């Protein structure tokens, strides 16, 4: 188990180092866009009618401002990745936070306003999945297709702020994107046969293939 964890850690470091090599000598990463489920959600579910909320204790007990909607006691994966990149860049450039372009946590789509969207937006939503119906028994959620639509709306707002689509595209082409989703398509869909029909319609192999195909199409839309 330890060897497996070490392998994952080494792989993660290599990926990040490869990212650093790619951006070395280039302009700073200006923005950070986050898509996913509760592992990355930082407050988008707070005002939704859903059981999947984390804006109350003991969530956030180790976060500076208390509960924020993150499904953790402190920072979530998206926050940690941003901070890890900050540390790596600091070792190399000594002014990494300025290089990355992030001077604060990325705001959730639900509360992102004005020019702060230019540094990035977090669209993740607890209980969300690749499939639109996933997690519906828990209440409202922002499934991946809707997160992508929200990103499209953000881009339109960016065009208004920047002044034209060409400049906006140039800005977006240097941004960092992270997507973490799919577990709810099992634990809050396929493995809940009393609520969802996917378990009776597809074998495990067929369902996995279906998810991969739909996810691939969604990534193409994002790109």
What are the functions of these language-model segments?
Residues 2-223:
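Conserved active-site regions of diverse hydrolases
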């Amino acid at each position: 188990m330890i060897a497996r964890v070490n392998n994952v850690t080494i792989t993660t470091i290599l990926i990040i180092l490869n990212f650093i090599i790619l951006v070395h000598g280039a302009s700073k990463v200006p923005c950070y866009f986050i898509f996913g489920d509760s592992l990355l959600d930082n407050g988008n579910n707070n005002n939704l009618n859903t059981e999947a909320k984390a804006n109350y204790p003991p969530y956030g007990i180790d976060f500076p401002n208390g509960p924020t909607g993150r499904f953790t006691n402190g920072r979530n994966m998206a926050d940690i990745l941003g901070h890890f990149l900050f540390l790596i860049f600091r070792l190399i450039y000594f002014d990494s936070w300025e290089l990355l372009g992030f001077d604060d946590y990325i705001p959730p789509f639900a509360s992102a306003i004005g020019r702060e969207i230019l540094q990035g937006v977090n669209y993740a939503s607890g209980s969300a999945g690749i499939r639109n119906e996933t997690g519906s028994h828990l209440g409202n959620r922002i499934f991946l297709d809707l997160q992508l639509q929200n990103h499209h709306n953000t881009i339109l707002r960016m065009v208004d702020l920047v002044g034209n689509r060409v400049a906006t595209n140039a800005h977006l082409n240097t941004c960092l994107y992270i997507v973490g989703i799919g577990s709810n398509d099992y634990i809050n869909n396929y493995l809940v046969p009393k609520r969802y029909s996917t378990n009776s319609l597809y074998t495990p192999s067929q369902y996995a293939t279906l998810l991969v195909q739909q996810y691939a199409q969604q990534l193409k839309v994002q790109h």
